[in-house]
Amino acid sequence: DLLGTLGNLPLPFI
Protein backbone atom coordinates (compact mmCIF):
# COMPACT_ATOMS: atom_id res chain seq x y z
CA ASP A 1 0.00 0.00 0.00
CA LEU A 2 0.94 3.72 -0.30
CA LEU A 3 1.23 3.94 3.49
CA GLY A 4 4.48 2.00 3.41
CA THR A 5 5.95 4.04 0.57
CA LEU A 6 5.11 7.31 2.31
CA GLY A 7 7.03 6.17 5.38
CA ASN A 8 4.04 5.87 7.70
CA LEU A 9 5.02 2.24 8.30
CA PRO A 10 8.49 0.93 9.27
CA LEU A 11 8.28 -1.64 6.46
CA PRO A 12 8.16 -0.71 2.74
CA PHE A 13 4.71 -2.11 1.98
CA ILE A 14 3.47 -1.84 -1.61
Swiss-Prot record:
On tissue specificity, the annotation reads:
Expressed by the skin glands.
Which keywords are on file for this protein?
Amidation, Amphibian defense peptide, Immunity, Innate immunity, Secreted
The outcome of changing residue 8 to W is: Loss of insulin-release stimulation (>30,000-fold)
Q: Tell me if Secreted is a UniProt keyword of this record.
A: yes
Q: Name one GO biological process term.
A: innate immune response
Keyword Secreted, does the record have it?
A: yes
Subcellular localization(s) per the UniProt record: Secreted
PTM annotation (Isoleucine amide): residues? 14
Post-translational modification here is noted as: Ile-14 amidation is not necessary for insulin release stimulation, since the synthetic non-amidated peptide shows the same activity as the amidated peptide.
GO cellular component entries = extracellular region
Summarizing the function annotation, the protein's role is: Peptide with unknown biological function that may act on skin macrophages to produce a cytokine-mediated stimulation of the adaptive immune system in response to invasion by microorganisms. It does not show antimicrobial and hemolytic activities but stimulates production of the pro-inflammatory cytokines TNF-alpha and IL-1beta by mouse peritoneal macrophages and does not potentiate the stimulation produced by lipopolysaccharide (LPS). The peptide increases IL-12 production in both unstimulated and LPS-stimulated cells, but it does not stimulate IL-6 production in a significant manner.
Family per record? Belongs to the frog skin active peptide (FSAP) family. Frenatin subfamily.
This one is known as: Frenatin-2D
- Supply the source organism for this entry: Discoglossus sardus
